[in-house]
């Protein structure tokens, strides 16, 4: 259905007097790139891994690479390019940038979006293959928890032991590893983990949850990955169609991909080897959500002919900040080594305050803000405070105590 739609679109565009096929493309953007960025953008002879340090122009490289692919003689049609991101905002910004290079008429036909939005689009077109209709419902987190709560109650289980949020996380983890209820029930390690957590009924809850979702014609967010993988695995003719359509696949923030996402990318690209992934193993912080750093660390082993590009110039931070970050990252035992540098000024030294309690930590921050406001007449909006988790509420208590407004 999608292929037919896109072919129809192509015919309409070619017949249009305003066809982008007749447009004169602007190639000046290549001159804006440094040597490493340019090499990454212009290489398209096989799989490529772009290791992009913080502030190194990663988004520019991705967007310019897509523009470059589109404007080459005998190049790619927009609908032959699949670009996967982790947020709708990132996809929207990238498409806007590409449109400025090649025109909105051309950019609009790109397959660009989050993993979930793209796979949802594919699943709706191919729903009958996996026993759904194209109108299937997508459950959000609240819907999923509500259904799990009902199942837990129906099974007569203690909700204090089987907390819906905890159960949901365990099921989500299974799905992110492409483990269906049948596989979960047969998995000794999963069962032992559930027993250790005093939740031996997880396997039964998972089975009921899976069945109830199918009966309701619904998928949760994780199902969008699982069913896409199953679709491509069990119906090779469908996979072949999408392999033929997506002649080039690009993936942003590859260090944040989980096993399921990585596996689907592999399904689509292992044969034609036209894939470019961009990321930074040093920025991998989402393992608690299923991200698998091995996807980027071992990319060159999975795609042996990979060309590796390293974007090492940081355009955002001062030398002091870059050196401090490098001194910490170099201690990582497993990493793709790079020499990040900055040509900006040295900058202010980094101050470190060691507190002896969370209360004192909050007081130090609040008092420092008050001191700087008195000395330099700063406004509250001039300060940004970062903390690791929302559970660090003592800082907020200090703000309240000292009547410091927060936004």
Give, region by region, the residue ranges found by the protein language model.
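Helicase P-loop NTPase motor core
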Residues: 50, 56-62, 304-307, 312-399
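P-loop NTPase Walker
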Residues: 18-134, 138, 240, 294, ...
